[in-house]
Every structure is written in C-alpha cells, then in structure tokens.
Curated annotation (Swiss-Prot):
EC number: 3.4.-.-
Organism annotation: Escherichia coli (strain K12)
Signal peptide region: 1-26
Pfam families, A to Z: Abhydrolase_1
Top EC class of this enzyme: hydrolase
Family: Belongs to the peptidase S33 family.
Ranges in a coiled coil: none
Gene: yuaR
Protein name as it appears in the record: Putative hydrolase YuaR
Length: 499
C-alpha cells in the first residue's frame, strides 16, 4: 500500500545481518517444516498462526539478467525468501500465492478468512505466503538502523535524511539494495511458481502487490492461470511519480470529505458536513496539537504528526472510521483514552516496515533532480490536493527522501511491453479507495481486457477477508474457474451514506 508518510514517533529496535549467501539455485526446492519448530517459531512474533502452517526458505539469485536468467556464475550471491504453506485439505490441485502490499509488508501470515466460500478454495489448493526480498524474515533484510553514536546532533533536516540513507546502504549493502526492487520481485514470483511445481501461476495480489503481479503479467503472459488484483496500482503511471502521488492525494481528500459528512450526520465527532468548514475545524485541531501536544499514559507526546498518521491510516477502512471519530472528538477535548492510545500504537508502522517501504520505492524510481521552484510547486500542488492534513501554509523546499537517494533502477527501463495479453485476470477495487483510486483498476482492466469487480463503498482491499460475501464469492469463483468472470458490482460499506 502506498501511504502518505509522516515521521514515526516510536522506534522498533532490531538487528539483521547484512550479508548474503553464495551458491547455486538449480535445485529450486523448499524444505517444508512445521512452523512450530525452530527456527521458524519466532517468525510470527505475537501473531498467531495455524498449527497446520508449514515454513521454509527458497533461495533465489540476488541478481537476474534482464531476461530473468541467473547471472552466469556458479558461486552467485543468493537471497533467501521466507515461505509459508497452508496445505490443501484434500487432493491438491495447485497453489494460490498471496502477494502482499507495502512495499515492505511481510506476507508469511496472510490474513484470510476461511469461512465459506473461501473454504472451497482451501479444499484443493495450497495457500502460499512469503516475505518479499529485503522484507521480514527473508534474508538479507533492509536495515536502516542507526546507533546513538551514529546519530548526529544539531544538524539540518537534509543532513538527517542523508544520515538515514547512509545507514540504509551501509547496513544492508549497496549491492543488495541495487537488486531489491520490483524488477527482481517479478522474477522471484516466477521462481516461487517453479519451486511449487505449478505449471501456471494462481495468485491474489493486494495493493503494491498488484504492481508486481501486473508486471509479471506483462513479462510472463502464458504462465498465468488466474490472478486477482485487489487495490490496484496503475503500472503505466510508474514513470511519473508525481502524477500518482497527486491522484492519491485527491482520493484521500475525497475520503476525508466522506468521513466528515458521516461524522456530522452520526454526531460522532465535531466536524461539519460542509467541506470547507470541516477542513478548517481539522486545521484548528492540528494547530492545537502542533503548539500544545497531548501526553499519553506513558508520558509520550501526541502531536499533529501523530493525528495525521492516524488519519491517513484509519481513513482506509470504513470499519475504522468510528475509532478515528473518537480520536478527533477526544483530542478536541484534550483527552486520550486507552482505546486511542492502542490505536496510535498499532497504527504506527514499525521502523522496519517503514524503512523497507522507502528503500524499495526509491530504488524503483528514476533519478529525478528538481529545482527549488519545481520542488515547491509540486509540494504546493500536493498540499492543495489533500488540504485537510496540510495546515502549515509555508511549503518547505527540502528535498524528499527519494530525491536524495543515490541508487536507482528505473522500473520503466526494465519493463517488457509484451503484445500478448494474458487471460485469467480479475481486478477488484473500492469505488472510494483513498490510496489506490478506483480509476487505477478501471485503466488496468481496460489495458489487459479483463473484468472489473467494483465494490460500491469506502475501503482498501477486501478479497478473501470474510467481510463481504459478494466479493468473496466472485473472487473464489474466479480462482477456481478462471476466464468466466464478467464485470460485477458488489455493495460495500458506506453505500448511500454520503454524496
């Protein structure tokens, strides 16, 4: 999921070795073991996993040629992808690979509700999860940790960014980072398919994962059996980073407007149904927190940045709107309840995930250098597109993280514009999705001549979650019987609530 990032307020301390193995990958095998055994029992932290879940590693090349073949060297550097398998309950027909979002989100414990109709899928299909290269339990992982000794004091914001970049490259290794992006991720999917013994790929991709799946569809059209894309990235927009950011910002503001109208109608928080008035009220609250942060029960401050981070995350799912409304109401009253403290703690992505997101996005982008005027103009356009969270009138001319990032592998240069259209694709999108706008799915469905499932409501990604029977039935039907899907609309949360 591409998110509008704000500074993290809590730090997760971690340590990951930044070396990689060497060897050959001809075997392409995964030695499955119970996830309850060492060393896999520590993979999931506090999360629970099924006792039936199997774990293992798949070794793949650190670098591929432009055609996806191994670099010609018997002692090539390898990365290890952390893999999980929930075996089919009866006779196996194949595997369904779950491609997680982010970039930077782990995928070894995918959230899938196996009630009916999803249970039909589980009957004959293995469910495969994996942590993408550089992420989670895969090895080596992106590591941007800085020790206290490495953190310079009394330096400019630009120097702080450069300090962070240097830590990422030094800890992870420049050669690893050079091959950590979407180009390699596409070929990793192909290696996973081969290792599983599947003749063709069956997969469900979420958010950023749809970018990997769409690039795979371009490069390996004949290797596809069935893919579902939920929360769709427009891969034809990847050559213009500013355009997709601008479209995302507009979508976030539209969702904020719908949230404010819902809030006013239900009297859940002190926001007006009038768009301009609601924005003004939210600005007043942000200014209040900016000038006088609240304090939680642990003595940590809650600032305007924290409310912005909470807002951009909780706007994503309609089921989270009541929590966001409570936060707005309580912060307006100078109150912080245990419920909101919990929401703040759970909403802040770990530093590990945030680092991976930033590094992978930057590696995928072209090396674009902006003048001061261009930079300020773009920042103003983004602020105007999502005015609700942009309460500070002065636009900084400070370069962004990716502009200062030195290692790029322009994703557009590695794409294969295949004229053969794959079959078996289904695109899924909420009508009101702030982070991957519905229009992305419409464009990609048209590009691949594929059906589109529109969820008429607010949200971001829903397939196989067990919260919308219409969606799950359509998705399972497509996975079991690809090629028979047509355009369909399912009713979602928020239908008819706001105009």
């Amino acid at each position: 999921m591409r998110v509008i990032m704000k500074p993290l307020r809590r730090t997760l301390v971690f340590f990951i070795f930044s070396v990689f193995l060497c060897g050959t990958v001809s075997a392409r095998q995964i030695e499955w073991q119970s996830c309850m055994t060492s060393p896999y029992s520590d993979w999931f932290g506090k999360e629970s996993s099924s006792p039936e879940l199997l774990c293992g590693y798949l070794s793949v090349p650190l670098k591929y040629t432009d055609t996806g073949k191994d670099v010609s060297d018997e002692n090539i550097p390898l990365v290890r992808l952390a893999m999980t398998k929930l075996p089919a309950k009866s006779k196996r027909k194949g595997s369904v690979i779950i491609i997680s979002g982010g970039p930077g989100l782990p995928g070894i414990n995918p959230y899938i509700n196996f009630d009916w109709p999803v249970t039909n899928l589980r009957e004959s299909w293995d469910i495969i999860g994996f942590d993408p290269r550089g992420v989670g339990q895969s090895f080596p992982a992106i590591n941007c940790q800085q020790s206290n000794q490495e953190r310079l004091v009394n330096v400019s914001e630009k120097q702080l960014i450069l300090q962070k970049i240097n830590a990422c490259i030094h800890n992870t290794g420049a050669e690893v980072i050079r091959h950590i992006g979407s180009h390699e991720a596409v070929y990793d999917i192909e290696r996973i398919r081969q290792a599983l013994g599947d003749k063709q790929l069956t997969a469900v991709a979420y958010s950023y994962g749809t970018q990997i799946a769409a690039l795979y569809a371009e490069r390996f059209p004949s290797s596809i059996r069935s893919i579902v894309f939920d929360g769709v990235v427009d891969i034809d927009d990847l050559n213009d980073n500013f355009s997709w950011k601008l479209r995302q910002a507009h979508s976030y503001q539209e969702t904020f407007d719908r949230f404010a109208a819902w809030c006013a109608r239900t009297k859940s928080c002190p926001l007006s149904s009038d768009r301009n008035q609601a924005i003004h009220q939210f600005h007043q609250l942000l200014l209040k927190l900016h000038n006088s942060p609240l304090t939680d029960s642990r003595g940590e401050s809650i600032s305007s940045d924290d409310l912005i981070s909470l807002t951009t995350e909780l706007l994503l799912w309609r089921s989270s709107w009541p929590t966001l409304a409570t936060a707005v109401r309580q912060f307006s009253q100078g109150i912080v309840s245990n419920e909101i403290e919990t929401a703040l703690n759970s909403s802040i992505a770990s530093e590990k995930v945030s680092d991976a997101l930033g590094v992978i996005l930057c590696v995928d982008q072209s090396d674009e250098q902006l003048s001061q005027e261009q930079r300020k103009s773009r920042k103003k356009a983004l602020a105007d597109a999502f005015p609700a969270v942009n309460f500070e009138r002065e636009q900084s001319d400070l370069p962004e993280f990716c502009e200062l990032w030195p290692i790029h592998r322009d994703l557009q240069q590695t794409r294969l514009k295949n004229t053969v259209l794959p079959s078996g694709l289904l695109f899924v999108a909420h009508k009101y999705d702030p982070t991957t706008p519905w229009i992305n799915a419409r464009k990609m469905a048209d590009k691949f001549s594929a059906p589109l499932l529109t969820i008429n409501g607010d949200g971001h990604t829903l397939a196989l979650a067990g919260t919308n029977l219409c969606v799950d039935e359509a998705v399972v039907r497509h996975l079991l019987f690809p090629g028979k899907s047509e355009d369909i609309t399912c009713q979602g949360s928020g239908t008819g609530d706001t105009n």
